């Protein structure tokens, strides 16, 4: 009996030791799996951050270049609507050529894909018209001021309607810093000049249309599955009719195209950059939030003005230059707000109760 008891205890001890070894092995395996999962997530986040930075840089270079080339092209040709129309037509034509060449960049023409882009280009045309009216009744300083405040309203729209968390303190400071720095620049440059209620009305209409356009563009990239080249085609092709209307409405049809130095070269170059900015713009918009995309546009404008002042110091001012540099610096502090984590009760709804 003693021998059997000893053997039984030994067997139990062996079983406990084996169970402990198996438990330790399982714990180590789970820990390793968690570490591997964490490493994979960190690698994925790093790759995503690099992708975002790459397309922000590409889009910014195209945007800044486009501002300069457009000025040269319009200056040489004298017809801004013709320059814009040529850029739209070439961008749409490039996608069609790619499709006929077998690139497979265009999907089926369906109502559920076409109608949203009709709405988007309608907002674009209305925004362009209201911007022209705003510039007629206000000055450049007022328009730049409104544009610099735009990320704040876009940020609010994303929070209310697009399930984004509210930006952290650093990002709020960043957005406010851009506004204050731009205000200092404008106060020392042209100031803000608004001609009565009509000027304020058109400035507000343009501002709100642009804010909705920015957020709706992000909505398109998230909810309508298509290639970036399809987005390039739809936005450019559908913007041609409103541009033709503007061509006649502004009286450009009664003018002759000027034959300034390098007119054709600058026109062709603007069309090439137009294709690049169309693609990089949609690609950039698809990888970052609407607020970040709006802020990038503001910083591109401020950086271009800074470059112009430094290279062509006709109206150089230390205060203006430092204010511009500060606005860009504040903008670089911005970090994207993540999506809100759904709550157990009422998960997947915005603060206004709109389901996502």
Regions found by a protein language model. Name each.
Residues 1-4, 9-356:
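Polytopic endomembrane small-metabolite transporters, centered on the Drug/Metabolite Transporter
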């Amino acid at each position: 009996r003693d021998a059997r008891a000893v053997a039984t205890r030994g067997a139990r001890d062996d079983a406990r030791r084996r169970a402990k070894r198996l438990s330790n092995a399982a714990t180590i395996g789970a820990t390793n799996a968690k570490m591997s999962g964490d490493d994979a997530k960190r690698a994925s986040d790093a790759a995503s951050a690099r992708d975002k930075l790459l397309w922000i840089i590409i889009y910014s270079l195209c945007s800044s270049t486009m501002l300069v080339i457009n000025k040269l092209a319009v200056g040489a040709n004298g017809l801004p609507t013709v320059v814009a129309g040529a850029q739209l037509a070439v961008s749409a034509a490039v996608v069609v050529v790619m499709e006929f060449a077998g690139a497979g960049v265009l999907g089926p023409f369906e109502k559920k894909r076409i109608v949203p882009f009709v709405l988007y280009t309608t907002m674009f045309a209305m925004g362009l018209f209201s911007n022209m009216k705003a510039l007629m009744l206000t000055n450049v300083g007022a328009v730049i001021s409104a544009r610099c405040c735009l990320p704040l309203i876009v940020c609010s729209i994303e929070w209310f309607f697009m399930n984004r968390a509210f930006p952290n303190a650093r990002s709020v400071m960043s957005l406010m810093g851009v506004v204050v720095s731009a205000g200092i620049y404008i106060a020392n440059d042209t100031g803000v000049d608004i001609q009565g209620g009509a000027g304020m009305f058109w400035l507000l209409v343009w501002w709100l249309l642009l804010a909705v356009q920015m957020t709706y563009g992000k909505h398109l990239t998230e909810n309508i599955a298509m290639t970036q080249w399809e987005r390039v085609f739809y936005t450019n092709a559908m913007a041609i009719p409103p541009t033709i209307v503007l061509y006649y409405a502004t009286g450009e049809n009664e003018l002759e195209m000027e034959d300034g130095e390098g007119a054709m070269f600058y026109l062709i170059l603007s069309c090439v950059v137009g294709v690049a900015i169309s693609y990089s713009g949609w690609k950039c918009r698809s990888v970052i939030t609407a607020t970040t995309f709006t802020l990038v546009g503001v910083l591109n404008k401020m950086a271009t003005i800074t470059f112009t002042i430094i290279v062509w110091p006709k109206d150089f001012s230390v205060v203006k230059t430092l204010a511009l540099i500060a606005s860009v610096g504040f903008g670089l502090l911005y970090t994207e707000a993540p999506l809100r984590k759904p709550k157990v009760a009422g998960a997947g709804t915005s603060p206004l109760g709109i389901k996502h």
